[in-house]
Amino acid sequence: VNSATGTALAAAGAAAAAALALGGCSVDFGVHTETRSYDVREDVTAVRLTSDGGRVEIVGSDAPGIAVQERLRWSNSRNKPRPRHSVADGTLTLSSSCGHTIIGGGACEIAYRVRVPRGLALQVTTDDGAISASGLNGRLTLRTGNGPITVRHLRAPALSAHTDSGAIRVSGRAETADLRTDTGTIQAAALQAARLTAHTQDGRIHLTGRADTADLQTDSGGIDATALASRRLTARTADGTVRIALSTPPDSVRARTDSAAVRLTLPASHSYAVTLESQEGSRRISPAVHQDNRSPRTVVVTTNDGSITVDAA
């Protein structure tokens, strides 16, 4: 195992005056901070980052090598975070741990900003903190227990983004995109994907772009997929309105909601085998929608208690 080389900018002082004199450290109402920066010069093909807490920012770059900035934050000398980094078998591993905390707890976290070559594979896991990634072309796996996930300017073979509590925002391209949050909105703006999964238990789903196969699901929240191109689309909600407007004729659409309305807009250029089922709600199909029970393009919309509207565009 080869350790990556680095330099600490300064060590934290015990008083504000001492912290100001050191430059890289500060003390703010009992909270200490320290910033460390270093470069990793070994050959690296993947990065694995694990953190108990703190914001993580990953930036793709055309520059060679990896640049790491760590901002430590702690409340007393007994729980100062201890960062670690090493390179083995082409993987840079970044991790940290906290010291013993006093009764009543205390602050202990490291915020990371890591600049990497665009094509590296990345795996980021943090218990508590936001994750942002931009300008990346490698395989991405992002996990946070509490915090939003933002991915921009993506050009990746695969993206997996999971958060227990927080919003997910994604733009760019991915062969496969798996987006999941227990509590929070999922927003995919102009996303291009061969296969998309977007699941949230409590939150809305907003989607534009292209997804050849799309699986959208929310327990409590609506689904808004407008200006979308999709060949195979499944949309399910327990309690939330479904609004879908497809810009290209689909092969298959399956939409279901337990207690809300469904509004679907299809291209008028093709015919569809349409099935609408609602126990307690109206059903309306525009005359502009070409229906043909023999069509290979199938549309099935089901609600327990909600209206169904199918229009043509």
What kind of region is each of these model predictions?
Residues 48-50, 57, 93-95, 113-115, ...:
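Soluble periplasmic/extracytoplasmic beta-strand elements of cell-envelope proteins
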Residues 2-78, 99-115, 283-294:
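Short acidic/polar N-terminal linker immediately downstream of export determinants
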Residues 68, 90-97:
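Generic recognition of long tandem-repeat/solenoid scaffolds
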